[in-house]
Regions:
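C-terminal structural segments of small proteins and small subunits
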Residues: 62-100
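C-terminal binding/interaction regions
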Residues: 21
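Short glycine-/aliphatic-rich beta-strand segments at the starts of folded cytosolic domains
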Residues: 4-14
Length: 100
């Protein structure tokens, strides 16, 4: 089993309301859920209006597929162009299922 995790931090230019931040989060979530089979959650900076931190995860049986999926997800978010990606980190974890 291969687990892909990605942590992304964004800067929201000109945002001054929680409503505006939620709109950006919802747009990113909706786009990714429609295009990719991933789970998404806002994981930090929830009280900072111009900062957004989301986590994305997916599970597969193939490491090369997972590497490609995480790259495609990051590129798709960048193309949405609702916020600037300040930083991101991707990890691919392998878990043995032989003992089950």
């Amino acid at each position: 089993m291969v687990i892909g995790c990605c942590s992304l931090r964004f800067y929201l230019h000109g945002n001054n309301s929680l409503k505006g931040k939620r709109r950006v989060v919802r747009a990113i979530k909706d786009r990714l859920k429609n295009d990719f089979n991933v789970s998404i959650a806002e994981v930090g900076n929830q009280d900072v209006l111009q900062s957004l931190h989301i986590g994305i995860s997916a599970v597969s049986s193939d490491k090369p597929y997972m590497d490609g999926l995480m790259t495609k997800v990051i590129n798709a978010i960048d193309k949405i162009n609702l916020a600037d990606i300040v930083d991101y980190k991707t990890e691919i974890l392998s878990m043995s299922t032989d003992n089950y």
